[in-house]
Each structure stands twice: as C-alpha cells, then as structure tokens.
Amino acid sequence: MDKIIKEDALQIASSNYVDWRKLRGKTVLIAGANGYVPQFFVHGLLKRNEIRGDGIKVIALCRDRQKAEERFGAYFKREDFQLLQQDVCAPIDINRKPDFIIHAASPAGIKVTMEHPEEVFRANVTGCENLLKMAAENGARLLYMSSVDVYGMLDEKRWISEEDIGTLNHVGLRSIYAASKRAAETLCMCFEQKGADAVIVRPSQIMGPGIALHDERLHINMISQMMRGNQIVLKGDGTPRRSFIYITDAITGMLAVLTRADKGAIYNICTELGEATVRELAEKLAGLVKDRKIKIVYNMETRHSDPAVRRVVSTVCPRSQKLRGLGWESKVTFTRACQRMMQYYGLEV
C-alpha cells in the first residue's frame, strides 16, 4: 500500500471525532468499497483494529474482484475482512448480520452519467432500497453517501445549509446523478416507517490519493494535465467557487455522523477552509511544482453559453456548522491537501 494512503488510514483510525465505542466488535458493510472514497472506510476501520484491537468486522461489497485485489489484497487473509463480490442492485445475501451499512456504491461523473444513465440511477435508488431493507431487517444503521449535487440550481448565495434546496431538471441526462441522489434520500425517509435507521451525508469535492488519473474530478483533471505537460487549461475564466475537503477529514466526518448523529439526520461534509475558486485551485497546484513553470490557460470558448447556468453554478460552497456541532473539526488545510495529492502522484512539492 502507498505511503500516503497508509498515513491517511492511520489518521482516520486515530480520530477522536468518531465514537469508536459504538463500532467496537460490530460488523460494517461498505457497499461500493472499490470506489476512491469508500476504500478509505475499509482502510481506516481495519487500521483501527490494528492499533486499538476494536474487533470491527469489515464486509467490502463490490463488483470488480480484480480491482478489489489491487485495493485490498493485503487484507484477504485477515479474519476481520470479507469481500462480497456482487452488484448492489441485486438482492444482498450475506451470512453475517451487519450492524452498520454504508451505501457508497454509485458511478460518478458527467461522462458515465451521459453514457450509462440507468446504471447510475439504479445504483443509487435500487441499491439504496436493497440496503435499506437489510438495515430494517437487521436493526442496522445505514449511512447514505449522497452529494452536494442534490441542492440543484440555487440563487447566488455564499453558503449552502442542509435546509436549502434548488431547482433540478429531473428529466435531463446531466441531472440523472443528482436526481437519483435526491430519490435515494427520499427512500431513506420512507423506510423509517419500516424501522430503518438512516442518516445522510452530502460531501463536497473530496481530495486525496488513490484516484485514477482519468477521473473527471476537477483537481485530478488539473494534475493529469500537469503530468502530461506544462500547462493547465481551464474551461472558462476560473471564477466559480467550490468547496474542497481532504479525504481524512471527509471520512472522519462521515464516521462521526454514522456514530453520533440522530436518526434521519442530514449533514454536509465540507470545510469552509477548503473554499477556493477554480483559478485559485489551479494556481495552488501549479505553484507546488518545483523546477518547472506551469502555465494556466483560460479557454473561454468552452464556457457554458447560457448566462443563467453560469450564474447559478458559480458558487457551490456548503456550510459545515451542523457537522461541527457533533464535535468534528477539519484538520487538513487546503494547501496541505494539495501537497499530499501532488506527492502521491509523484509531482515534486
């Protein structure tokens, strides 16, 4: 396992923001475990067993065994780890009762959404239904990993709270991801009547190691460009503001919600310290590269032609006030998050 990932797993396992007493000796099912973000639930929980002997049983549900071997091969012979290879949309049958379920199984990105909209929708909605049924039957708590995309198009405002809601074109292909996340959130509320205990998290853009360079995430696209050459090409003028959070802060925040939040609660997973414009992100990453100058190019021809769309998506910065009410605080600065990513991808810092 990479050094950066090992260090991040240790940070998660050592966090005081998680109520580890509730996880001690329990079974945690992680759906979509192969994904960039959910893999860190696996790493963090198993590292906790190593340093504190908490006896947490981790079941990693994923479709691709080869990818799972690459991510978790070192755990395959451990008694506290079980690989469950299957589609989350199929009925889930396991021989061990889960105490906690984390639903993080969902393709993400504009390209995959446009090419495979039904797969994206079903992973969120059908997958969530299957896991909610399991939660209700076993008296387990489910954490649904939603997205800040559910807020849709909001009038220009500085911060987004959990109570805000914007418009969303639910029949547009580009909106399938957000629409399916909204639908799954509604399912979580519906299943409360059947005894399901569900909590929802809405992460902002999560930065960290272990993301494939072909990923569509904004910061990964920039790093990929720098690895191929000496420039970053931005679509537009770089003025839209976004909220970024490092993986260790995101995972500890979500585990805090899993172990401390009230039933049915919804939390943004973000930090105001990670707010930056697209231009500021590009300048920060470019400035961390030593021994060569990275040029930032603004391609105005690719800017969205609709002024209304440009306006409503210019700021996507959720508030963390509610999450901080659980005792959580961000520990990784925006600069440090960028540095660790650059180190992971072999760019000099």
Question: Where are the predicted features?
Answer:
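N-terminal Rossmann/SDR dinucleotide-binding element
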Residues: 1-100
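C-terminal substrate-binding subdomain of Rossmann-fold SDR/epimerase-dehydratase oxidoreductases
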Residues: 4, 82, 226-349
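NAD(P)H-binding glycine-rich loop region in Rossmannoid oxidoreductase-like domains
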Residues: 85-123
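Glycine-rich NAD(P)-binding loop of the Rossmann-fold in SDR/ketoreductase-type enzymes
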Residues: 100, 115-130, 171, 175, ...
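Short-chain dehydrogenase/reductase
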Residues: 121, 169, 173-182, 216-217, ...
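Conserved Rossmann-fold NAD(P)-dependent oxidoreductase catalytic core, especially the SDR/UDP-sugar
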Residues: 129-174
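Flexible, glycine-rich beta-alpha linker
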Residues: 150-152, 175-176, 199-217
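Active-site Tyr-X1-5-Lys
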Residues: 171-199, 227
